[in-house]
Amino acid sequence: MNYELLSVMELEDKSKTEQTEAEEQEGAMSFWDHLEVLRWALFRSACVLAVIMVGTFIAMPYIFDRFILAPTSNDFFIYRWLNSIGGGIVKLSSDFDVQIININVASQFMTHISTSISLAAVIAFPYFIWEIWKFIEPALFEDEVKHLRPAFLGGTIMFYLGCAIGYARVFPFTYRFLVEYNLSPSITNQINLQSYIDNFTMLILVMGIVFEMPLLAWLLSLFGILRKSFLREYKRHAVVVLLISAAIITPSGDPFTLMLVFIPLYVLYELSILVVKDKKKKEDKEDD
């Protein structure tokens, strides 16, 4: 009797196992199913980008005059602010006013399109991140979802903050120094539109990427590659590197503008120390 009961229980367990495996196989997506999901994600992202681009294209003349070309005039808000508080430390010339020239027939039209796409991509960045998250979330474990969800949000915020710092601090000082630099009095600077846009876009996006440093440090610590003790031990070396980086970004020579760029970089380093998790200490506590 007991033998028959055990046989029935084994058959039921086997049946349940087979049913579970069948459900998992049914719920599992094939390679082509994943491609289909990715295709629709890319399609939705392209539609969102196109809609936003229409808006940025229409508003681009206003955006160009009020924001993109604003650092070419001495009336730019950061210049006025420095003149009001700088005193004798910061000396900005009062006649700074650069005229951007165009040397190609189609350059203005192509710049209109390219800047509209770039600005639309920056505005749509959170939506792109959301689509990426939706695509990879089903393949993640619960613990990974718990860690990566705030990372995606924090990375987006830090990217926008970095772009804002790049626009308000890094680009104006770098641009002003390079424009006012004269190898010879007989040479007149004439800034080409494409050259201006390339530098404008590059410096702002670079600062957006640099502001991902705490997120990168945190992710490296999760994999055991980076430790809090390492960042603390080499803090003095990092300060020197950050000062050199700030001097390269803002080659104007005065300490005030140097500090305006160095301080955000140093704050990012301190944030990296705060967010990094030292796995070794955690394992030692668990062993105790």
State what each model feature region is.
Residues 2-288:
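Membrane topogenic/interface segments and analogous intrinsically disordered interaction regions
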